């Protein structure tokens, strides 16, 4: 059962073709495109996929129009895509959001992927799931797979653009992360980086206090590599967490 897994974010589309819906399996092909160029997928990367996908499962946080553009590219094969919609529970994770369907599908899928990884490692422990991209989410999962809640904060780029738009004289080149910045470029870059790291570490403390044991911290997303150098807590950087979740969901649904 070949599976095409699709992750449509705010900026990019990422995809991976798997020989079967088995969690932990390796893709036979994968790629990524900025949303501006997704109309070329059917004539480019996807045109030569072999074997062709028998099933398509994806999550999308972009607009309906973007999703429809992707569906047009999927007409290359006679297969109807399924899009993940968060619910009350799935694949061992219970949704604690006040309105479960309003949780972002990417957050939901990442939580399921994180839970699957923890169980595959033979552990039952709380997990803090960080997705760093255009926005940053920091979500708490207890040892029983209950999603307790989480944070949404602006990503580093949004922070800098907001400061540039609202403050005179701050249109400066990107700086470096320094403990004690001595110029405006470094001050802006360090400030954004430390703000995100601080939110992550505070939620880590909250989750440890709630569960009575140190949680595992998993960082994913296109900007994850920018975040982890500032963290003082133990963490893992896992680029494939969304795909881990999609594989787990596909395996559960059959």
Curated annotation (Swiss-Prot):
Specify the protein name: Type III pantothenate kinase
Compartments it resides in: Cytoplasm
Name what cofactor the protein needs.
NH4(+); K(+)
GO-annotated biological processes: coenzyme A biosynthetic process
Its recorded reaction(s) are: (R)-pantothenate + ATP = (R)-4'-phosphopantothenate + ADP + H(+)
Q: Which GO terms describe its cellular component?
A: cytoplasm
Q: Where does ATP bind?
A: 7-14, 134
Q: Does the keyword Transferase apply?
A: yes
Q: What is its EC number?
A: 2.7.1.33
């Amino acid at each position: 059962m070949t599976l095409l897994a699709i992750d449509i974010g705010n900026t990019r589309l990422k995809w991976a073709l798997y020989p079967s819906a088995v969690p932990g399996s390796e893709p036979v092909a994968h790629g990524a495109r900025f949303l501006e160029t997704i109309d070329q997928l059917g004539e480019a990367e996807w045109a030569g996929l072999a074997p062709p996908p028998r099933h398509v499962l994806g999550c999308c946080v972009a607009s309906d129009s973007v999703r429809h553009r992707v569906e047009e590219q999927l007409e290359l094969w006679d297969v109807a895509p399924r899009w993940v919609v968060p619910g009350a529970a799935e694949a061992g994770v219970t949704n604690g959001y006040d309105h479960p369907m309003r949780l972002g599908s990417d957050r939901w899928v990442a939580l399921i992927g994180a839970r699957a990884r923890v169980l595959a490692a033979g552990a039952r422990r709380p997990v803090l799931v960080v997705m760093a991209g255009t926005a940053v989410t920091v979500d708490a999962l207890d040892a029983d797979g209950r999603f307790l809640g989480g944070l949404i904060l602006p990503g580093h780029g949004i922070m800098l653009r907001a400061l540039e738009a609202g403050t005179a004289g701050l249109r400066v080149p990107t700086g470096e992360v320094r403990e004690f910045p001595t110029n405006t470029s470094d001050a802006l870059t360090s400030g954004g980086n430390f703000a995100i790291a601080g939110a992550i570490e505070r939620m880590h403390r909250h989750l440890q206090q709630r569960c009575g044991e140190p949680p595992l911290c998993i960082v994913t997303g296109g900007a994850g590599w920018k975040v982890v150098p500032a963290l003082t807590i133990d963490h893992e950087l896992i680029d494939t967490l969304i795909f881990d979740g999609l594989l787990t969901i596909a395996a559960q649904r059959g």
